[in-house]
């Protein structure tokens, strides 16, 4: 609220990221494409925004592009990884979204994603 009169170029990267996410949330579309929506946020705000988005996007089809394996493991119902060898489907943790960062199945999935990302042909 304190920034509502500011022009976009006067906002920080994280503030602009939050405005973009808020605009997307307000549109109410059944299909949503999010390209690195949490990338410019600090860890605390990132976790809060992930939780907010997960709740507000429940029941919608969401394609989330991320370079963060932990984020994919925490938020993904279906996970694909693209690396030098192609496109790979990964089984996500079986617990419901939004998963705790430190849950064993989330950590195992994150490890699997990191190993796959590090593969070289």
Language-model regions, residue ranges each:
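Conserved ABC ATPase signature
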Residues: 7-11, 15
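Helix N-cap at the start of a conserved alpha-helix in ABC-type nucleotide-binding domains
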Residues: 43-45
């Amino acid at each position: 609220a304190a920034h509502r009169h500011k022009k976009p170029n006067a906002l920080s990267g994280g503030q602009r990221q939050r405005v973009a996410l808020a605009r997307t949330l307000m549109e109410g579309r059944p299909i949503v494409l999010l390209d690195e929506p949490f990338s410019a946020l600090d860890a605390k705000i990132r976790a809060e925004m992930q939780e907010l988005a997960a709740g507000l996007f429940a029941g919608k089809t969401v394609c989330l592009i991320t370079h963060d394996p932990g984020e994919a493991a925490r938020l993904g119902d279906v996970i694909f990884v693209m690396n030098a060898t192609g496109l790979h489907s990964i089984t996500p943790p079986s617990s419901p979204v939004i998963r705790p960062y430190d849950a064993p199945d989330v950590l195992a999935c994150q490890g699997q994603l990191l190993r796959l990302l590090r593969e070289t042909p």
